[in-house]
């Protein structure tokens, strides 16, 4: 995808898809690689080890390229010294590659796409509550560990879990290029499993709960 490389792990013929997009979120990578040893589906793992990927002599956030508007802002944010012509050319490359990449990572037949992320100081579920359609916040859970889902049936199931969960089922007025909005726009069920960096056991538990309870 626009020069951003991914390693693919496939186990069986399940239509379930998993993706890891930020190379500095190593806890999520370990949780996903461990999960794929015993569970069916196809996983896409970015090959870099930093948050921003190398991009034709510059850098780009791999989770802000899934719309033309988001990609344009992303290119401008990280590559301000580029000429207008180069920025336009790089945007055209992303726009050209996006449909094929989405066709590979988005499941068919009502399948589920699961993204795994880790957070650092500051970001937590409370920042998502204002733009969510429903929330289930558990008193004994850390605010930095939570699910974001885009399907109400999935939300109702995950709300019964021990973990925090929010539902975001309406498309944003401003598309920032994140995968969640692209999945929603294509009618694909999407869940993000967000945990603190370093809390591998927590992310494994949340991933296992999802695997056992979402079909």
Where are these regions (language model features)?
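Structured catalytic-domain cores with a bias toward divalent-metal coordination
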Residues: 1-215
């Amino acid at each position: 995808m626009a020069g951003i490389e991914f390693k693919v792990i496939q186990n069986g013929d399940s239509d379930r898809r998993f993706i890891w997009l930020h190379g500095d979120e190593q806890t999520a990578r370990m949780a996903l690689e461990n999960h794929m040893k015993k569970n069916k589906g196809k996983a896409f793992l970015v090959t870099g080890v930093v948050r921003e990927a190398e991009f034709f002599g510059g850098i780009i956030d791999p989770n802000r390229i899934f719309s033309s508007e988001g990609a344009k802002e992303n290119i401008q944010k990280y590559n301000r010294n580029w000429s207008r012509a180069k920025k336009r050319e790089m945007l055209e490359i992303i726009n050209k590659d996006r449909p094929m990449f989405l066709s590979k990572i988005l499941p068919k037949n009502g399948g589920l796409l699961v993204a795994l992320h880790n957070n650092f100081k500051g970001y937590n579920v409370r920042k998502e509550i204002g733009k969510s359609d429903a929330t289930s916040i558990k008193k004994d859970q850390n605010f930095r560990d939570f699910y974001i889902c885009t399907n109400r049936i999935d939300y109702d199931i995950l709300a019964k879990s021990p973990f925090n969960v929010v539902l975001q089922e309406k498309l944003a007025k401003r598309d920032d290029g994140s995968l969640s909005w692209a999945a929603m726009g294509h009618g694909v069920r999407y869940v993000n499993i967000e945990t603190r960096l370093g809390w591998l056991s927590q992310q494994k538990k949340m991933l296992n709960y999802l695997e056992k309870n979402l079909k």
